[in-house]
Amino acid sequence: LFNEQSPRGPDYNDGHDFWTEEQRMDVYQQWIHKTRYARYLEEFQRRENWGETVSRYTGFFEDRLDLKLTEFGRAILDLDVMPSMRCLMTAGKALERDACAGYNCSYLPIDSPRAFDEIMYVLMCGTGVGFSVERQYINQLPEVAEEFHDTDTVIVVRDSKIGWATAVREMVSLLYSGRVPKWDLSRVRQAGSRLKTFGGRASGPEPIDKLFKHMVSIFTHAKGRKLNSLECHDLVCYIGEAVVVGGVRRSATISLSNLTDDRMRHAKSGQWFIENGQRSLANNSVAYTEMPDTGAFLREWTSLYESKSGERGIFNRQAAKDMVPERRDNNYDFGVNPCSEILLRPREFCNLSEIVCRPNDTLATIRKKVTQATWIGTIQATLTDFRYLSAPWKRNTEEERLLGVSLTGIMDCPAILHASDKELQGLRDHAVKENVSAAKLLGIPESAAITCVKPSGTVSQLVNSSSGIHPRHSSHFIRRVRNDKKDPISQAMIEAGVPYHSDPRNDGSWVFEFGMKSPKGAITRHDITALQHLDIWKRFALNWCEHKPSITVSVRENEWVE
């Protein structure tokens, strides 16, 4: 509980009454906090409560920037706005060491062998990665050697994020030259060991051992030619599969490919989830660079329908260039983050913050939250001292200082759901104005793009709101979550009587089941049609977003032709 024993003491609350998670959060919200964002306090032999987590986050930036963030801390504490949840998790020594860990979003094309180890590092920092296997990029890769032979070279994998990334870099370099090395994993700590700086528990040596075996297989099958798009895609998926914390996957990616790329069009067709389960690690989208003819579009649309997975999705790069704000340089081939709400230059980061829209909010209270979320995002944008990565990452991130100020709970909040175009534009312009003020105070460039709507999968669960621009799933449903069997919280959940079973795909994890009930009168996915949902998306895309809204549309069988 947040009390006088807290590291920053009672003064943090600025005279407000102390409160516990039990007073503001139900058991599932507490689960999300404890398993995703709470750090272990050695001094007290327990995990943080919510107040201590918020205090650690605000204290990190107060000490770093010599600012007082009491108002913003209170807004986060009360679940009115949310910062980058990557920052919330890692604020402290972990974020001091790896600034990359404070960012939610990144993008890079697979145009260099270095792309693979940079992806490993970025994913291990907890940042989502968008990547492209379009031919104009993968054609820049070198040819794989014509012959392969085993060598006595040994890759010694050091037990750190940079250690793993460096090992991937060495492996790629050796395989391109036709040499198959041995690898030494003796320095990698055992599965279940607590990660004191970054948080969570170690995955052990097995994931990187499996990754190296897959890498050897892919490269040897490509001897004498360049890697094709699907091979590059699978390499990234295997890298993502290796990024595991405490037996639970911790990576998010999206893959962009050409319209005419049949390999990628059918990457998730048939029994792919059995034969190529690694492909579940990436969302797949086609990148349009011009208006396709009707036949080409219908072939892609039919493939999307027949896949039953909603993939490949559709990303129109030219439309993305046309929609960016005037102050942003659009002479770049933008890509996207895994949830596709942020437009990014190649090798660039973006941090997110979030406005929680409640049923009783008014435009005035939302405007105040816009101010708070924009300042929080701008403060987070000061983190640009990146380790390990190539120079363009720092250059692009510092030049644009991208923010992703998002709205969640839109369907719960009549004031924002039914806001006029002019009112949404006013809120967007207010965010831009507040960023100008914050950037001036902090001595950094103004942000090139600010507003978006992210899907808010985890944040909405933490704050108990509908997700982003989506309706609630149903009036009643079961939420299933995975957790490491060795985690003491798993045992606590079992003792508390939470239903559970073993994860059929991972013997090291339990699957816990939480019964969920939506608020009375909440809009659910059964209450709106696909076209109505898209109309709402369009209104927020045109009037609120300087990036774009991320949306998942539930399409009934009779709605596809419409």
Give residue ranges: language-model regions.
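Extended catalytic cores of very large enzyme megasubunits
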Residues: L1-E562
